[in-house]
Amino acid sequence: MSGYPKSYNPFDDDVEDEDTRPAPWKDARDLPDGPDPPIDRQQYLRQEVLRGPSATAASTSRSLFLMYESEKIGVASSEELVRQRGVLEHTEKMVDKMDQDLKMSQKHINSIKSVFGGFINYFKSKPVEPPPEQNGSIVPQPSSRLKEAINTSKDQESKYQASHPNLRRLHDAELDSVPASTVNTEVYPKNSSLRAYHQKIDSNLDELSVGLGRLKDIALGMQTEIEEQDDILDRLTTKVDKLDVNIKSTEKKVRQL
C-alpha cells in the first residue's frame, strides 16, 4: 500500500513556485525600460552611434601607418639597389682596365718574339701607353624613374613626420588635426564628434590613395633599375669571358718565348 493519500498528486513536487524561479538573464548592454530614459541610456546610444566611425577611423590610421612603413622599406631597398649598381659599374670599369693592360702586354710580347729585330723594334717604336686612370669613387646613377620615385617618397616622408611626429601612436587624438577648410562640411553629419570621425576617415583614405601611388612608382622604378642592371651583368659576363680567353692566350705566348 502506498503511503500517500488518495488526493495526493505526485507531480505537484515538480511545479516550482513562481516566486522561487530565477530571474531571466539579461545582457549588460540591454537598455533599461521605462517611460523616462535615464542619462545612461542616452550616453549608451551616443557611444553606439560613434562606435563604428571610431573603429573605422582607427583602422584607416593603422593602414596609413603601415603604408608609410612599407614606403620606407621600399626606399631603403631602392637605395640598396642603387649601391649595387655602383658596385657593378666599378667592377665593369676594372675589367675594362684589365683588358687594356692585357692588350699592352700582348704587344710587348709580340715585339720581343723576333730574335734579331725584336729588341730594336721594341725600343724604337715602343707603343705609347695610356696614362693610368684615377681610381676615384664612382657615383652610381640610377634610372631616372627610380631616382624620381626615391626623391618623391623622401620628400613626403619629411612632411609626414612633421604632421605625425609620433608615428607609432596613431589614434583618435589626430582627429583634431583635420583642417576644416579642406573638406566640405555640408556632406558630413551635424554632430561634431561624428563629423570629425568622418572627416578623419576621408582624410586617411585620400592619403592612402596617394601613398599607394608612390609605392607603385617605387616598384616600377625598381623594376626599371633591375632591368638596366641585368644589361650591365650581361656586358660584364661577356667581358670577363673574353678576358679569360685573352689571359690564357697571353700565358701560352709567354711560355713559347
UniProtKB/Swiss-Prot annotation:
Phosphoserine PTM positions: 77-78, 114, 163, 181, 203, 209
Gene3D superfamilies (alphabetical): 1.20.5.110
Main location class: cytoplasm
Membrane topology: Peripheral membrane protein
Bias kind Basic and acidic residues: ranges: 20-32
Biological role stated in the UniProt entry: SNAREs, soluble N-ethylmaleimide-sensitive factor-attachment protein receptors, are essential proteins for fusion of cellular membranes. SNAREs localized on opposing membranes assemble to form a trans-SNARE complex, an extended, parallel four alpha-helical bundle that drives membrane fusion. SNAP29 is a SNARE involved in autophagy through the direct control of autophagosome membrane fusion with the lysososome membrane. Also plays a role in ciliogenesis by regulating membrane fusions.
Assembly with partners or alone: Forms a SNARE complex, composed of VAMP8, SNAP29 and STX17, involved in fusion of autophagosome with lysosome. Interacts with multiple syntaxins including STX6. Interacts with EIPR1. Interacts with STX17; this interaction is increased in the absence of TMEM39A.
Name used for this protein in its record: Synaptosomal-associated protein 29
Organism: Rattus norvegicus (Rat)
Gene name for this UniProt entry: Snap29
